[in-house]
C-alpha cells in the first residue's frame, strides 16, 4: 500500500512559537487576520478546541491578539516556552489547536483513567489488558509552513521490550495510511542498521510496531525509561522508521517525568509528577518533560528556531536556484529562436 503524500490542508491555519510572556496573549499573524478574519466575522470572540478535550474555550480577540481566556487555555494544556501551537480555522471563528513540542513532534497527553478502563483491548493478548496505552492527543495536517510532523516519540518499557511490540499514535498511523491491516516496515537506527518489522492495527483502533523493536533497543543500548523519537521516511516501497534521537550518554539516570494529563472530569487538565516506574504505568509516556531547567527550555527553543531558519533558508535557496535554471532554459530557447530567425532572414535576402 502506498503512503499518502503530504499536501497542504484545506483549512487555513497558522502557527506561533511559545515565547516568554506568552500567558497574557498570543498574536494572530497580520496577513492571516487580514485574509481570513478582518471584515468577515462579527464579534470579538474566538473558540478554541483540542482533540483530547471536548470542552470549547472562549477567548477574547482584541485586534489581532487573543487575550482574555487565553491564559486558562494555556494552563489547561500545559503549554511551555519552546512549544509551538498550530491554529486551524474550521470556520465561524472556531480553531482546532495543536501543540507541538521542541522536538517538532506532537505533544502527547495521557487520557483519564476512566477512559482507560472503558477501552477494550482485543487481539493483543491477555497481558495487555492492564496496560495503559497513551493515545495521541491532537490531530494535525502537515504543510510546508508547519513543524515536521513525520515523527513521533516513544518510551522504552519493560512490557514493550518483553512483547517486542511498541505503540504508534493513532492519528499518526491514520495520516500515513498505516491504521488498517498490516504493513511491512523497516526500523533503522542512526548508524544505518536495519531490522525488518511490520505495523499491525487492531479492532480497538490501536496500532503497533511488531517485531524488531527489542533488537533495535538492545543494539542501541536503550533501557527501560529511555525515550526515543522515530522519523518516518517516505520510501515508495516500504516505509522506514528511522531512530533520530535517543538519550545522551552521561545524562542523569531516570529523572522523574512530568506528563500532560487530562483530568477525569473531561474538562481541564492538570500537571503532576509521575513518580511511578514507566513499566508500572503499563504504557509509554510520550513527549514527557523533565521537571527542571528554564534554561533547558530556552536552549530547546533556540535549537527549534535554528532548525526552522535553516529549513527556510534551504527552501529559499532551492527556489532561487530553480528560478535561475528556468531563466537559463528560457534564455537558451530565445537564443535558438534568434539564430533561426537570423538564418531565415539571411536566406530571404539571398533569394531576393
Swiss-Prot record:
Residue ranges flagged as DNA-binding region: 11-103, 151-246
Transmembrane regions: none
Cellular-component GO terms for this entry: nucleus
PROSITE patterns for this protein: B3
Alphabetical list of CDD domains matching this protein: B3_DNA (cd10017)
One Pfam family per UniProt: B3
Protein name, per record: B3 domain-containing protein REM5
Annotated source species: Arabidopsis thaliana
Taxonomic lineage from the root: Eukaryota, Viridiplantae, Streptophyta, Embryophyta, Tracheophyta
Gene name tied to this protein: REM5
